[in-house]
Amino acid sequence: MILAREAGYRIEQEDVETHLFIPESFFKGPLEDFWKALPSLDDGFEKRRQELEKEHKRLRFIATMEDGKCSVRLCEVNNNSPFYSLEGSNNIIMLTTARYHDYPMLIQGYGAGASVTAAGVFADIMSIANI
């Protein structure tokens, strides 16, 4: 959403198409029930991870924007994908354009992570307090 907005698109969270990988039933009822039920998915995800590993694939969250429409989903990526080696809070932005069609431009680096995000929030609080 941030990149879409920076590109000049007026987009809100409800405009982003999401593809759930958790059963819809998990979202019905209190949040406490969600957290209690979540571990029941662990074995299935681990089995899938092991199967993908044999095929030299991994699961990655990938968000896309095309023609002003945004979506986010859990995807299987091959070991030749730039997303394959992402770990921790690392991120990749891959720009596929008319000029960068066959070989998209990649921007890769650390995402915020918990400590950087906390430092940013603290800096914002201090900035507001000094106004």
Q: What kind of feature is each model-predicted range?
A:
Residues 1-85, 90:
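Substrate-binding/catalytic subdomain of NAD(P)-dependent oxidoreductase enzymes
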